[in-house]
Amino acid sequence: MSTFVRDTGVNRKSILQKGQGRTRKLAKLAYIYERESRYFAQVAETAKEMAGEELLTLGARDLSFVFRGIWFTAAKKDFYRITYHSRLLSRVLAPLISFACTGKDDLYREARKIRWEEFMTVKQTFSITANVSESGITHSNFAGLRVKDAIADYFRDRTNRRPNVDAKDPDLVINLHIHRDFATLSIDASTGPLYKRGYREASVSAPMQETVAAAIIRMSGWDGTMPLYDPMCGSGTLLAEALMAYCRIPAQVFRTRFGFMQLPDFNPGLWEDIQVAAKKDIQPLPPGLISGSDISEHAVTAAKTNLMGLHFGGNVSVAQTDFRQIPGIADSLVVTNPPYGIRMGKDKDLKGFYQDLGLFLRERCARSFALVYFGEPKYIKHVPLAPSWKKALTIGGLDGKLVKYELY
């Protein structure tokens, strides 16, 4: 990580020639995010509208919606806050340069122009994530390799050494996006996907991704004025995301390393202020407000393990029981992600299963609301209830639908 802090106005040394350094004026060599305070949020298409609302509440402005993403403007403190708090975004990117890119030589040449020693040392590791669409460069892996070569050669020419690539746990993640022969190179502000919260210590087959669960909780409108119950909680992802949302716990509270720490203008004091303010804003979870159950002993154990890693997780009760055996859940929000073909491994008895679920909701959940996520929407028709609404939620590799039922 660079030890220079742009906010002080002190010139940094940049390795501009092999084995030789010299100072340069910062204003002339600023990157896009520095000049324009402009950033890019990657988000699933069906979650984009609510992600935009979330961005605004976290301090973003001047939103511009594009395919699978949102451009936004933010002060540095809000950029840190968004990366730390967002529950819906996949990644937040700080763009460095954009350029016309019609072939591999353009990629290599422009990537070599970036002062990579400002973002990492030759002893640190990096990885490239690349996305290519409607371009003369047709393979994202090939495009990423050209950027990798440019970075490696940049350091080799100046230090006689090449930094290593680490796809699993890199110090720096560089994002390459090419669309219609126009490329942008960015730094991943979180050094990895934001759905990785850090509380998942145990899992079950085909677990729900955290950003999907967070989107469901947000779409439910749940504000803690009624109890929340998940009768098929699996490893507890919906319960955990409901807890974090209610308690106002930052989504990345367990992440200790962020990509924005590698940026040349990183401000440690400002980042500390964001964390302190977030900690003061946390509120406790009343016992009994969030609870769940599952027929599987393994799932219940996994859910308890994951919840105990969270603040106030001990206030969430999880029991082992078949939802068909639950006497009743009145005046509550019932939210769940039932088993489907992918999770069950076969379609046997699933029609009857969903009929039983509908009867349970209708007969034992008086004066409640139910939000049911169907990873395979073909099963919606087998629930003997009339939905209030159905909304697509294609995120985390699932082409699913969230269905709301009002129960009287």
State where each predicted segment sits.
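A short, flexible beta-alpha/helix-coil linker loop
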Residues: 133-136, 192-193, 339-343
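Short SAM/SAH-binding signature in class I
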Residues: 331-337
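Conserved Class I SAM-dependent methyltransferase catalytic core
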Residues: 32, 38, 42, 46, ...
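A short, acidic, amphipathic alpha-helical segment used as a generic capping/interface helix at domain edges
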Residues: 118, 322-326, 353-361
